[in-house]
Amino acid sequence: MPIFKEYTDFDAVGIAELIKSKKIQPIDALDTAIELIEKLDPTLNFMHQKTYHFAMESLNRNKELNGPFAGVPMLMKDMDSALYSVPMMQGSNYLKNIPMKFNNSLSKKFTNSGALICGKSATPEFGLMITTEPTAFKPTRNPWDTERSTGGSSGGAGSAVASRAVPIAHASDGGGSIRIPAAACGTVGLKPTRGRISFSPSHGDKWGGLTHSGILSRTVRDTAFMYNELFSQEIGDPYSVHYDKGTLINALDKNKKYKIGFNTDTRIPVSISDEAKNAVRFNAKICEDLGHEVEEVKIEYDGLLLSRAFVIIISSHVSQMFNELKDLVGRTYKKREVENASRMFDYLGKSFRGSDYTWARYTIQKISREVMQQTNDYDAVIMPIISQSAPLLGELRPKKSAELINDIVMTLRLGSLFRNHSIRDKLLNKLAPDSLWFAPDALLQNVTGQPSISMPTYYTDKDMPLGVQIAARYADEETLIDLASQIEKASPWINKKPNVS
């Protein structure tokens, strides 16, 4: 039996309150988390590295239990989370056994909050897939059905939080990677506004401003309290988004009435399942019953154009990432060390010209403006984040046709063909639906930079969670926390536990 047997009944704020009131000792929570990790991880594979020593050292240094999350166990994602002397493997054999030489800004903020970092959670290689099935590690499994995916790229965090091994975990989101695992695993996942959380000291932004750091949690209040600690800029950051301390905590009890739109469609040429549409309508009905003004809204944009621009930006940054990693590792990667899809992104990025990248940036900025103008009359918009409940493991891995194209292009060195816009567009038009079918509109708020939250309010006939996303205006997480808190009280999920927990 766990040392603190009620551990899984409490969220992170609840555990912190028990520790502060001396009803439990911080070592009790840490030992219980370690026991649960050791019990659950062999089945779920949500861990890439264990850092129990790091957690214990933090606890020994923080004898006064400073910070709102003092003594609360958590995980850091194995990306965007530099811990001194701990490798950041990013799901790749290429980076195994390469210790980091610094603590980044985000890991310092988590440590300053008092949270105890017990390990590095699983991620697909370099965060490039929306399923957490890297070839360097065992696939991460969904605790609701272990034959199914957790989504990605923060799938390890989603599985760990949903299974209640830890109440809170770091996540990051470059195209849905906070909200997709939240929706698939049944957790709360809020992607913040662009620029809220610094990537200092190593980067100004990631993926041209598309990537955002954040967390997964089990409750809205955990999200509000932790982001209250994380929201701040560092000197030299490329974006500045002011935050008044305490705003999100105060928003938990505002209970304002809002004008809310809902949309069940997508402009990416893929299908949204009936169950995903039902999930949107279910959440819209909750909002209507709460007294909010709710109406359907159509959002028009060129989905294929957006997906092409998205791939160009990502692949360009992946190529630059490999340049940086070469300096870190001391050599170029070997073919067997890096997955085919990752090498394809690298090769694509090297084939694009500066004008291609500029076109892609202008394109997403244009579409961002169009989307924000169409939705600006609404305080929040509800839309699908995933097109169905979690698919079986393997279904979100690259299709064989895509793998074959990868091999041909890289073997014959045909990357220059992508400089021909006609050939490039035809190929990307074919590949985009294959890569985006599970989460077609996940990237929309990465493009606009707006905050967006997913919550586990809806469950399918097979008792699988199927979250939706609710987006707000730029820099308005306050509205999302208020609305999400209202929805959580009207349709609570805290007592729903997955099969493996």
Predicted regions and their residues:
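A short helix-breaking turn/cap at a secondary-structure junction
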Residues: K191-A284, Y301, S491-S501
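Short glycine/serine-rich loop segments
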Residues: F102-E234, Q450-Y458, K462-G467
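Short, gly/Ser/Thr-rich active-site loops of penicillin-recognizing serine hydrolases
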Residues: L417-F418, L480-S501
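Acidic/His- and Gly-rich active-site-bordering loop/insert found
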Residues: A55-E57, N62-A136
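Acyltransferase
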Residues: K23-D31, N60, D274-K298, K326-G330, ...
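Short helix-loop capping/hinge segments that flank enzyme active sites or metal/cofactor-binding pockets
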Residues: P2-I3, F69-Q90, L252-N263, S316-M372, ...
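An N-terminal boundary/leader segment
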Residues: M1-E57, K285, D289-L290, K462, ...
